[in-house]
Amino acid sequence: MKKIIAFMLTMTLALSVTACGGGNKGGAAANDTEGKTAVDILNDAWAVYEEDEKFAIAGGDYENMVMDAPGTVNVSDGETLDALLGFPAASADKIDDAASLMHMMNQNTFTAGVYHVTKADDVQAVADALKENIMNRQWMCGFPDDLVIFSVGANYVVAVFGAEDIVDNFEDALESSYASTKTLYDEDLSF
């Protein structure tokens, strides 16, 4: 009888250790942006696109414009962040890296911005301010359909607005590239 009980306890211990071994999948996902820049995140998402989903793009800001690829945006210029990407100038001191990817013909068709928030505790506050700033914009040349704001990893905020189908493709590409992607806001802008 002691052998049977010892065997049962051993099996229970073995099963519990085995079951606990696969439980830390979230830790790897939370760190999937470690060592990445804002441009890297956009490049990784863009690389997932099929050829028939791609369109003419440009990236960067007025001083760092890149054709056919994402580009870096100067985070010390709050006015440019706001004018180009809808990022609130008052929150510029909370980020230390940014990048953009835009439809070459019309920013309202598609614009994506990635922002590295210096303190992880500020991610939600940055996302809130970004949402409010974009929702209150006066649009020219038509309204974008959707605004979606994500957190990626511990310190990145990604905002994308534009035509619904293009925004949906970007969302799929970002989630495919980064398992830590969480949707914070999904708003209709086509009032």
Place the predicted regions along the sequence by residue.
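C-terminal motif of bacterial Sec signal peptides marking the signal peptidase cleavage site
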Residues: 15-19
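Soluble, non-membrane globular domain cores that form compact, hydrophobic packing
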Residues: 21-111, 117-191
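Positively charged n-region of N-terminal signal peptides that target proteins for export
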Residues: 1-4, 9
